[in-house]
From Swiss-Prot:
It comes from Rhodopseudomonas palustris (strain BisA53). Residues 145-175 are annotated as: Disordered. GO terms for biological process: protein transport by the Tat complex. Residues 145-166 have a biased composition (Low complexity). This is Sec-independent protein translocase protein TatB. It is a single-pass membrane protein. Belongs to the TatB family.
Amino acid sequence: MFDIGWSELMVIGVVALIAIGPKELPGVLRMVGQWMGKARKLAGEFQGQFQEAMREAEMADLKKSFDEVKSAATGFTENNVLTSLQKDVDAAMTIDKVQNIDTPPAVPTTPEPPTAETFAEAEAHAMQTTVTEPLAILPPAVAEPAAAEPAVPEPAATTAPVAVDAAADKDAKAS
């Protein structure tokens, strides 16, 4: 606090001893100590109040910045593109629900996957129809007699005998 050295402190002590006297010097020093304690206590209280005011100011600034961030976050969620799109989709869905009540259910546009029964029905239908024209392009001389006689459909050849014949040919070539 005060820039007082040892030599200056000794001079103050000697002057106090001469001015006050040795008899009253301990009481005076005690009173000066009490004043110093009171001064330190007041300085501590002032410093504490000052620091508390600084903390409150910092807290006010912190609260203000927190409120700014909170309002920005609220504004961000209100102006969020996804939120607005979600609101539009929800509105469209409610309109679709109102329209779906009045209209009958739509027929699916994708065909059902074929089953073994549909293949059997198609083969039976093909067997019942007669072929009036030859399936292969033949020269005109051969095509005329075939047209004169009604064609009898031959049963469809299966792939299993062809596979057996191919296996038999391999066995014959190997021997």
